[in-house]
Amino acid sequence: MRKDKMENFEILPTEENLIKTLEADLLGRNQQLSYFYNLLLAQKGASTIAVDGKWGSGKTFFIKQSTMVINAKNPVSIIEKEKREKILSKLFLTESDNYDDCNLAIYYDAWENDNDTDPIVSLVYEIAKQLGMTYTFDPDTDFFKLGGAVLDVFSGKNLKGIIENLKSDNPLSKFKEQKALEEKLKDFFSEALNERGNRLVVFIDELDRCKPSFTVRLLEQIKHYMHDERITYVLSINTEELQHTIKNYYGCGGDERRDRQARLL
């Protein structure tokens, strides 16, 4: 008796598949990718852009291709010349000979990291790893050490922590640590962009699949500590699911939920 097997037509976002679908425009998205690249290139100052779509709509594929296109355009990226030409030729782009005119792109899978206590640590680590950085932090003001103390007080719903801090003998100590953390992150981003590019584009994927506490914590930490004029954040999200996440975390709905979402994004 003949048994038919159901074929799996899912295209995984491997590097090979990302390039193949670009070459033949199999997904019919090349024009959108080109428009999106130019949109990102036109960003001035700190900005956040949301790529909104339901689960299974191809958001991950789209932002991984966008990451690849941005880095292919940058002459200091590690993409091989043959691959670079394949990527850019299909989008009518040419390789730049000046990194000052280019962006750098980083892909961060939030869902893979949602067991981390402090999202900011895994995000900075991912940036350093993907850029091949050997950045050395001052052990006296290492933000990995500062992060635990400062972020516990200034993130999430930890109002009690803020009140206790204000009652302490030195109520400004945490605020000073906060400023030290901000300065270390600015130094880090300056090092990341030095002789590599003009702006950094950080793609954050799978945010709406994370634990509510991680999602809110990550967005708050980016807002408070990683807000930089040289960075564009691209959030791959399902807006409806993100609204549920915010509602579950804060216990609010309606206008208050939308207001909190607007502030976070």
Pin down the residues of each PLM region.
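Catalytic acidic motif of RecA-like/P-loop NTPases
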Residues: D52, G56, D205-V216, K223
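Walker A/P-loop-proximal flanking segment of P-loop NTPase domains
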Residues: M1-E95, V121
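Short hydrophobic/aromatic beta-strand immediately N-terminal to the Walker A/P-loop
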Residues: T48-D52, Y107, F203
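Conserved catalytic network of the ASCE P-loop NTPase/AAA+ motor domain
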Residues: L41-K44, W55, D97-D101, E191-R196, ...
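P-loop NTPase nucleotide-binding core
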Residues: S57-N194
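Catalytic P-loop NTPase motifs of RecA-like helicase/translocase cores
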Residues: D114, A192, L207-K211, L242-Q243
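The catalytic "switch" region of P-loop NTPases
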Residues: R2-A24, R29-L33, V69, R196-L200, ...
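Conserved strand-to-helix beginnings and helix N-cap segments that scaffold or border functional pockets
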Residues: T117-V121, P212-L219
